[in-house]
Amino acid sequence: MLRLGSHVSMKAPDMLLGSANEAASYGANTFMIYTGAPQNTRRKPIDELKIDEAQPIIEAHDLRQIVVHAPYIINLGNTKKPGYFEFATDFLYQEIQRADAVGATQLTLHPGAHIGAGANVAITQIIKGLNAVIRPEQHVQIALETMAGKGTEVGRTFEELAQMIDGVTYNEKLSVTFDTCHTSDAGYAIKDDFDGVLNEFDHVIGLDRLKVIHLNDSKNPQGAHKDRHTNIGMGTIGFDTLNKVAHHPQLPDISKILETPYVGEDKKHQLPPYKYEIAMLRAGQFNPHLIEDIEQQR
């Protein structure tokens, strides 16, 4: 089954109920949320997330494949800041509890950045952090994300991700989020040889680990290490490749999540593209008037 969705908001007063309704309005059958603002630690108690109230919408629209994105402020690779490791692991452990509570199947996590200490030092610290938080009884898998290699990010190669996975005791609780923009920006030939890239992923990590795809076009050329998403078919990867990824026979039932930018010159009145991008991908036909159609929502 083709599972397409997007990032949706989760905010008061409707919380998860609002997230499910937003996803349904886009014609999605999967979705991704942050359990709070990704740049801070403020979180509502689990009993205020309206989890039970959301269930009828989730059932009616087959939205049970929920992805939670861990907050950006968690950097398990940081070995420089005293006391930070305890903060990062405590907060990630709380996010695992929240992801389990909302019924998420995957918790996407940026592995981290070495901030000058070197990739191997950071990877060792990331393994230590994952071993500190993962419990065999948790339901959600932590889906380490492929990174663009911006700055001192680690996880820019399949080998780095495999090294992390191999070092974790309960690594059956680990999976991978494959971001098409990040992976292209990291230097992989997504546009020209996606099958070859997928075969390389299978050889290095194993396709059985691939549980989430972030389906994004890129503003920059292959190998740019920039991480700038753009709308489907409007970037350097292009519609044909992203449509191939969405419908790829080796990737059935995997959540394909759009993180493409809102549309509009006025930042206060930008519009979500997801209903239109999902429809375009389901049809398998590029819409050259995509941006105009989105702007007609006004």
UniProtKB/Swiss-Prot annotation:
Taxonomic path: Bacteria, Bacillati, Bacillota, Bacilli, Lactobacillales
Pfam family, one: AP_endonuc_2
Residues engaged in binding Zn(2+) 2: 145, 179, 214, 259
Leader sequence residues: none
Cofactor dependency: Zn(2+)
Record note on cofactor: Binds 3 Zn(2+) ions.
Family annotation (Gene3D superfamilies): Divalent-metal-dependent TIM barrel enzymes (3.20.20.150)
Protein name per UniProt: Probable endonuclease 4
The UniProt record lists the keyword Cytoplasm: no
Documented EC number(s): 3.1.21.2
Provenance organism: Lactiplantibacillus plantarum (strain ATCC BAA-793 / NCIMB 8826 / WCFS1) (Lactobacillus plantarum)
Residues holding Zn(2+) 3: 182, 227, 229
Keyword Hydrolase: yes
Molecular function (Gene Ontology), one example: deoxyribonuclease IV (phage-T4-induced) activity
Function recorded in the entry: Endonuclease IV plays a role in DNA repair. It cleaves phosphodiester bonds at apurinic or apyrimidinic (AP) sites, generating a 3'-hydroxyl group and a 5'-terminal sugar phosphate.
Family: Belongs to the AP endonuclease 2 family.
GO BP annotations listed: base-excision repair
Sites where the protein binds Zn(2+) 1: 69, 110, 145
The reaction(s) this protein catalyses: Endonucleolytic cleavage to 5'-phosphooligonucleotide end-products
Annotated PANTHER family: APURINIC-APYRIMIDINIC ENDONUCLEASE, ENDONUCLEASE IV ENDODEOXYRIBONUCLEASE IV
Record NCBIfam families: nfo, PRK01060.1-1
